[in-house]
Amino acid sequence: MSRSRTRRGALAASNVCVLAALLATASGCQVFQGPKTKFAVRPSAQEELADVRVLEQPFVLAVPEDAIVRVVGPTMTCTGTLIDDDLILTAHHCLVERGPYGEFSKHVIDPASVRIELGGDYFAWGEVGVRHIVAPPCGEGGGAGDISVLVLKRKLIGMSTMTPRLEAPPRVGEEAHPVGFGRCALSPDAIRRKGRDGGPIRALSAETLHMDASVCPGDSGGPVFAKGSREIIGVVSLSAMDHDETTRGPSVMARLDAYRLVFAHARLVADGLAPNELPPLECTPANLPPPPRR
C-alpha cells in the first residue's frame, strides 16, 4: 500500500515537472523573440538609383515633333528644339535679363529659372530643368549671334531629336519655314505648337538669313527648317508682326553655321567639363576668315 502511494506520488511529481517545463518553454518563446524588421526613413542608394532609372525611361508618349519644345523663363516664353538628348537650341535674346523698360541686357538669366515644357498640345505632358546656358557675347537683342544652347539637368531618353545643319550654309532661294509656340492676338486658339508659313530665302549675311514668314510672339528661338527635311538652318530672331498669324512679314533668322563653337561648347559642358575651362566664345562667324592684321 505504501509502495503504490509512493509510485503515485512520484508520477504526480514527474507530471508537475513536465508541466513546469512546458510552461517554461512557452514563456521562453514569448520573452526571447527574433529581431523586428526595421524600415529606413531615408531612401537607400539602391532606391535612389531606381528612381533615376525611372526618370530615364523612354518617353512612350512622345512623337517626333515633340523635339520642338516650349522654353519658359521668368519674363518670357519662347520655342526651342531638342538637338541631342540633353541639349536644347533656342534664341539668345530669350535668355537675358530685361531692363526697367523691357530693354535687353547682356546678362544671362539664372539657368535654374528656366524650364522646358514637353508636348505640342495645349498642356505639357512633362518638363525638365536647365543646368547651364551657352551663348555668344552678342545677339542679346536679336539678329547676329542670336542663338543659344541649353544644357539640361537630365537626358530625355527616347525622345526624337532634330539636326542642326552646320556644315552646309543656307542658300539664297532655298525654301524654309519656321515652327513655334507663338500666339498672335487674333489667333483662334490657345498656345500650342504650329508650323508657320515660310518661303524662299531672299538674302544672306554672314550671321543671318532674311525671308518672309508668319511669326507670332513666342515663336522666337523656334527652328527654321529647310523645306522637305528636318535639318535646322536657323532660329527665329526678329520679325515684322501684326495681330494675324497668317500674315507673312519680313523676318530675320539667326544662322547656325556661323556659330559652330556654341554647339561644341555645349556638348563639352553636358559631358561634364566645367564652363570656366573652355575658351571664351567670340562673335566672329566661324565660317569667315579672321580680320587682317594692321
Segments and roles (model prediction):
Residues 63-109:
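Catalytic histidine site
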Residues 26-28:
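C-terminal motif of bacterial Sec signal peptides marking the signal peptidase cleavage site
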Residues 71, 80, 86, 90, ...:
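Terminal peptide-recognition signature
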Residues 43-63, 101-157:
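Conserved catalytic-core segment of clan PA serine endopeptidases
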Residues 91-95, 217, 234-242:
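Short beta->alpha transition motifs characteristic of CBS
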Residues 128, 144-212, 241, 245-266:
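Chymotrypsin/trypsin-fold serine protease catalytic domain
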Residues 31-81:
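N-terminal activation segment of mature serine protease catalytic domains
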Residues 31-32, 39-41, 83, 111-112, ...:
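C-terminal subregion of chymotrypsin/trypsin-like serine protease catalytic domains
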